[in-house]
Amino acid sequence: MKKKTLKRIDLLLLVIVILLTTVLVYRISNKEKLSDAYLASDTSNVFVYDEDDKEVSLVRGQLVSLSDKTKEMNGNEYHKVYLGGTVYYVYKDNIVLDRESSVLEKSLYVYRTCSVYEDKEGSKLAGLIERGEKINVVGHGPLKDDGSVDRYQFDGGYILSKYLTNDKELLNISNPFSNDTSNPYGAGSASELDYIGNEKVQVEGNVMPDVCKSLYINREAMEDIEDYIELAKRTAVNTFVIDIRDAHIVSYKSDIMKERSISSYDAAAFTMEEFKAQLDKVKDAGIYMVGRITVFKDKNFMIDHPEFAIADLNDDGKPFMYGGSYWPSPFVREVWEYNVELAKEAVIKLGFNEIEFDYVRFPEQIDYYADKLNALDLQNKYNETRSQAIQRFLMYAVDELHSVGAYVSADVFGETSNNYVTAYGQYWPAISSVVDVISPMPYPDHFNTHAYNIEEVVWEVPYKLLLAWGKEAKKMQDITPNRARVRTFIQGYNSISRPYVVYDNEKLLDQINGLADAGILDNGYIVWNAGSYIDNYCLYEDALSR
């Protein structure tokens, strides 16, 4: 009896052991195995499902814990993943094993003609690519936390993602000026320019005043900057437009100049440290700082790099001299790079809020010398129109300067209030759609004596003149998509044409009121006095206080 009982116990124990072993083997064999993986997609977001089978959007490039468990959904296999303690189910093609591979775009379309970069980072250019072209993606720039990338690589270099799309339908967006084929001065038709425009940004930590009441400050004035700061404190002035480079007049010894234009570096009045010390006083006073750079009029740079100049074919191909200066060609990308790097340095090292590009144009009468006389080599490598070169430079400059937290403004002639492309390549809508601020220069003494059929000499009646001019400028601004703000130059000096007129406080106020009544004052004004004479500016204290 005892032996039978023991046998039963042994048998029972054996059964228990077998059952426990079976359970253990089952558990071991069914234990969830986890490994690192990344969410991947051909857009910045990945669509996945949660445990309730609801569709959820997650940012691509995120690290997840990939389970060896799968789930059948809609006839497809989905992998179980863990992200932040939450379970999701991801389609197998949206899982990769390294973060760089999480960008799945294979081909994209160029929907705005744009610059091509040499590298995944930096401002060095490799060429140009036209709207409508299809690229095969072979790489990309750094993947950002929001799942986007700034640049895509193809066999010709890198393109900013903002100029690319996977939606071919976007190529059918019509040009609002497509019926305009006028080309009166040979600088290109309005219909050949880009009006998709840059979305206007609010740079974090860099607040542009709603109305900029501005004084122009040249290199010499920086020596006594305290006087101008005191004037600003007594008035409503809140912005200084400060020279970085004015043609051959250079303010400070820039490291970029030392590297790329030693003649410019040697011509500088201040060291960078000295100049920054003066700028710090401006910043400490709460004044918005705009750095002015003359772009395509630069004698010193042409001395160092004649190969980038507009060439005079009547003078053995030497740099073309016009208006007392040599002119870098707006078609040459090395010129673009130099000026943009100079601007970025000014923002990063000196703290400018905004860069204002002046002389962002070809020389006056370029149509006569280049088109009629065939006397110039403009070095037009990409067969662009003059207006395309100007607009595309500004597109490049805006992209680069926005990346370092600065705004961009461009100076244009008062002539741009007319609805045609000027000979020197400026067309109001093409520029206003790209930059943050457009700054026209309708100086009264630069107009024809009886412009707009005004009976009086127009610089004797600046209110009437700028009211008439402003109404025309507003028409151009109103037809511009994605338009910039308008900050207009006004005349802060006595007229240089007969009859000579003293421009006193009343005349300054007349200009401001004319612009305001025309509805074009918008982002304020800049008082232009080439000498930046403090005595002249003090004469306007009443007008500047309003």
PLM regions and their residue ranges:
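SH3/SH3-like (including bacterial SH3b) beta-barrel domains
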Residues: V48-R60, E118-R131
